[in-house]
């Protein structure tokens, strides 16, 4: 019965992750254009406002995630899924009717408070799937949010063309309302709450694990992963404009090149998760960081669009393995009663990585050039590669999270 429950939940949560990430990424490409309709802003002002509006979500998320993790260990993962999907639906609706940028900024801050559908999906699946299949399960789930991330901008552009900006935000709100209903009706959780007296603080929670140093290292690697992932995409179009001889189709080409890592991730994440279960998640994490480093180094020098595109596609295979393997290592080293809190702390480091990556991308590329930006990404990958061996876990110390 437990086997049937976690597999069914995986299917529902895969769809929920796809819709959730899709709804979020639908907003990304049209937000700067929407802001232009709300006032007489210059290009630089729009760029600054866009950066602030996107960054506030991650900053709030970084602060609030540990609180939600503590609550999830007391109330269960399902209430957190409903909180996140319902909250995002409300935020999309608020943006759709926003009369000015201040309301949009507030909506995005609220989104940071109620975010976490994908992270709680990962935490639920990690707690329900057998330890021997955690990599496969998390890898499969990763294809859902990656597919949403991949298709969202394309769908957003089409919807905005036919329904306008506000209509697109309304559709995103309807998508998240659908996810809320599906999660409410179909997701099952046999939850055994942790008594409030047994809920520890952050330091005590980490010390209570068998290998807290491994968990802390995974947190740092997670931040580095998110920083590298978010450093490149914001500058893709400007970078390509430098190396293309005919930039007339720049928007289309930029979209296609940006999608290549996502395509590779969707194609390979499930299989790579299986390899991690078979040969060890630390090995998979190390190889993924090594491949990422090798594929980023030539991007410092490449000026040919075809070679650059191939390298971006190959980078996607690295991305496909990184977060699932890191999350599987967390699962193996965390007592199931603390899993919600540990995953929420990891979510905080993900959010910090997102902010750091965006800042890295904009500042370094603006003052030192695009080649220097790729060099900094390589340095971050190398730091992760050096840390990866320290996540190795003695098999006898693994914590089985599927005992429920």
Predicted regions and their residues:
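Structural signature of the two symmetry-related core transmembrane helices
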Residues: 79-94, 173, 283-298, 378
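Paired small-residue
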Residues: 91, 102-110, 295, 306-314
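Pair of pore-lining "gating" transmembrane helices in MFS-fold secondary transporters
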Residues: 5-33, 37, 211-231, 313
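Residue-level signature of mid-helix packing/kink "hotspots" within the transmembrane helices
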Residues: 58-66, 116, 149-150, 262-270, ...
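Juxtamembrane intracellular "pre-TM" segments in multi-pass secondary transporters
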Residues: 1-7, 188-218, 403-404
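Cytoplasmic helix-loop-helix junction between adjacent transmembrane helices
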Residues: 107-145, 328-329
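Short amphipathic helix-loop junctions that connect adjacent transmembrane helices
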Residues: 30-47, 235-252
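Conserved MFS/SLC helix-loop-helix module at the cytosolic interface between two early adjacent transmembrane helices
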Residues: 62-95, 99, 276-282
């Amino acid at each position: 019965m437990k086997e049937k429950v976690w597999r069914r939940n995986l299917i529902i949560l895969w769809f929920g992750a796809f819709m959730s990430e899709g709804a979020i990424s639908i907003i990304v490409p049209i937000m700067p254009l929407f802001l232009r309709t709300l006032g007489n802003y210059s290009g630089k002002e729009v760029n600054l406002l866009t950066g602030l509006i996107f960054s506030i979500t991650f900053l709030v998320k970084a602060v609030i995630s540990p609180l939600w993790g503590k609550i999830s260990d007391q109330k269960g993962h399902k209430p957190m899924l409903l909180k996140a999907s319902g909250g995002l639906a409300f935020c999309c609706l608020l943006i759709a009717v926003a009369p000015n940028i201040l309301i949009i900024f507030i909506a995005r801050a609220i989104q940071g408070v109620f975010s976490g559908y994908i992270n709680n999906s990962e935490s639920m699946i990690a707690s329900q799937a057998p330890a021997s299949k955690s990599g496969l399960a998390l890898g499969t789930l990763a294809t859902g949010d990656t597919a949403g991330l991949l298709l969202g901008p394309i769908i957003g552009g089409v919807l905005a063309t036919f329904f306008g900006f506000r209509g697109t935000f309304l559709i995103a709100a309807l998508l998240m309302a659908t996810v809320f209903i599906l999660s409410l009706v179909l997701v099952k959780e046999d939850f055994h709450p942790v008594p409030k007296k047994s809920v520890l603080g952050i330091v005590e929670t980490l010390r209570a694990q068998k290998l807290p140093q491994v968990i802390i290292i995974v947190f740092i690697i997670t931040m580095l992963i998110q920083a590298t992932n978010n450093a490149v995409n914001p500058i893709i179009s400007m970078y390509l404009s430098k190396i293309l001889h005919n930039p007339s189709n720049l928007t289309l080409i930029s979209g296609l090149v940006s999608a290549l890592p996502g395509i590779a991730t969707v194609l390979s994440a499930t299989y790579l998760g299986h390899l991690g279960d078979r040969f060890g998640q630390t090995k998979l994490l190390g190889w993924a960081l090594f491949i990422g480093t090798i594929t980023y180094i030539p991007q410092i020098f490449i000026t040919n669009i075809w070679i650059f595109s191939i390298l971006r596609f190959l980078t996607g295979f690295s991305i496909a393995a990184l977060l699932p393997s890191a999350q599987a290592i967390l699962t193996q080293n965390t007592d199931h009663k603390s899993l919600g809190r540990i995953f929420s702390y990891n979510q905080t480091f993900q959010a910090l990585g997102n902010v750091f990556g965006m800042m890295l991308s904009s500042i370094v590329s603006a003052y030192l050039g695009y080649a220097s930006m790729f060099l900094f990404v390589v340095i971050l990958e190398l730091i992760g590669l050096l840390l990866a061996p320290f996540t190795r876990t003695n098999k006898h110390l693994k914590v089985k999270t599927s005992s429920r």
